[in-house]
Regions:
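Extracellular/periplasmic carbohydrate-active domains that bind, remodel
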Residues: 1-441
């Protein structure tokens, strides 16, 4: 039973020590935590270990403060996610109305939030919305979808088998000082309908994108499709070590709903600064791998008004260890620090330092523009989208350095990709173009 209630606040150290289900070196806290989140505006979780055997639900007007030595752990074998907000709606099949219910004013600050996992388990296996996998696009430890006013600060995510934190349909947010420890998929996975926010100081070990801004995404990776607007991302540092994936994804697209409506999953007004340890910024459309033709007709998306400042990238080897990149295939083996396979307008680079190994990989560049392909002939399987045609317009740069040398003419380090007929296909193969590249003084 909860005791010592004062002014809408509770310290969990006041909970009577009885009635808990034992687990390993501690106890199962699911009921007590959910009761506290539902009943009190402010909850303090002191240092200690808190095991959880089902999802924690956070309603509006809830502030959770956890001691830095508090560990809230989803126990092994639980298929559902660790924590989510209350008013989640699945927007996979139909557009969510603008006036759909949202939660408001949620904060989670401090603590270690983790799982007892040792590998990525796969979509629908861990991080589910519920036991029945009702919202199949949810695959995460934390989910915030349908929130106005969100704060996440000073958190550690540990051993997440799916995404560490999945975000969608959120307006007005601050995410700051987040560390990932041995997380096996994406770190921060941002989907559509997200606007007016700041992300600051992300670091650590993830085995897929450290941060993904996926306005368009696969059906097994999102329940929110739509624009990402007015976002600043500052202070991103990919960790080192075995299996760390050093990528930052920025993915727009045109998403088709079941009723025939289409969603412009654009990304506009984005500033990215103070980034290190990243190999590649993935700014291209990538649909699920397919044979013959993609499962859905996904349109090429648009990115407008994006700035990269104070970036340090090591692209001396491809981030994706596919055979065509490693072998230097002259047609499909091009890779770059900035890989564009979307329609990009108004992109600016300032104080960007890139390392390339042109001796080993002469097909490596500062930027590529155009389609990508990795075709596995014996399976007739395509991993990328070679039919993409796109353009990068109004590219401005200042103080760009490649292998320590100032780039006076960046156009020489931009590869325009154009595919002829790579293999038998009913789809036309794509091409890229770059328009108006100029150096600022």
């Amino acid at each position: 039973m909860l005791t010592n209630i004062k002014h809408g606040k509770i310290d969990l150290s006041c909970i009577a020590d009885g009635g808990f289900k034992p687990y390993k070196d501690g106890k199962i806290w699911s009921d007590e935590l959910n009761r506290a989140f539902k009943t009190y505006r402010e909850i303090f979780i002191p240092a200690g270990r808190y095991y959880v055997d089902r999802s924690l639900i956070v309603p509006s007007d809830t502030k959770i403060y956890a001691d830095e030595h508090a560990e809230i752990i989803l126990i092994k074998g639980v298929k559902t996610l660790l924590l989510r907000n209350e008013s989640v709606i699945d927007g996979s099949d139909y557009k969510i109305p603008d006036d759909a219910p949202c939660d408001e004013n949620i904060s989670v600050c401090g603590g270690v939030w983790g799982e007892e996992n040792e590998e990525r388990l796969g979509y629908g296996v861990s991080g589910r919305f519920d036991e029945n996998d009702t919202f199949h696009g949810v695959s995460t430890c934390f989910l915030f979808s349908g929130v106005r006013g969100l704060t996440l600060k000073n958190l550690v995510f540990r051993a997440a088998a799916g995404f560490a934190c999945q975000l969608g349909r959120t307006d007005g947010f601050t995410i700051e000082n987040i560390r990932f420890e041995n997380c096996f998929a994406d770190g921060l996975h941002v989907n559509g309908g997200v606007k007016n926010g700041t992300v600051k100081n992300l670091s650590g070990h993830t085995e897929d994108d450290l941060i993904a801004l996926n306005a368009y995404d696969w059906d097994n990776s999102s329940i929110n499709f739509g624009a990402i607007e007015n976002l600043t991302v500052e202070g991103v540092n990919c960790g080192d070590g075995q299996n760390v994936h050093k990528s930052f994804r920025i993915q727009p697209g045109i998403y088709p709903y079941k009723n025939g409506e289409k969603e412009d999953c654009r990304i506009t007004n984005l500033t990215v600064k103070n980034v290190s340890g990243v190999t590649t910024f993935k700014m291209y459309l990538q649909t699920p791998a397919y044979t013959d033709v993609p499962e859905k007709e996904i349109g090429v998306g648009r990115i407008e008004n994006v700035t990269f400042e104070h970036i340090s990238a090591d692209t001396t080897a491809p981030v994706d260890k596919q055979p065509n990149y490693l072998s230097g295939n002259p047609v499909t083996g091009n890779f770059a620090t900035f890989e564009i396979g979307s329609n990009v307008k108004n992109i600016r680079f300032s104080d960007v330092a890139v390392r390339l190994n042109k001796e080993k990989y002469p097909n490596s560049y500062f930027m590529t523009v155009g389609p990508k392909s990795q075709y596995i002939e014996e399976k007739h399987l395509e991993l990328f989208d070679p039919y993409v045609s796109c353009a990068a317009e109004n590219i401005r740069y200042k103080d760009v350095r490649i292998n320590g040398q100032i780039a006076d003419d960046l156009e020489k380090d931009i590869k325009i990709v154009e595919f002829g007929k790579l293999y038998p296909s009913s789809l036309p193969f794509g091409k890229g173009k770059a328009v108006c590249i100029r150096r600022e003084k």
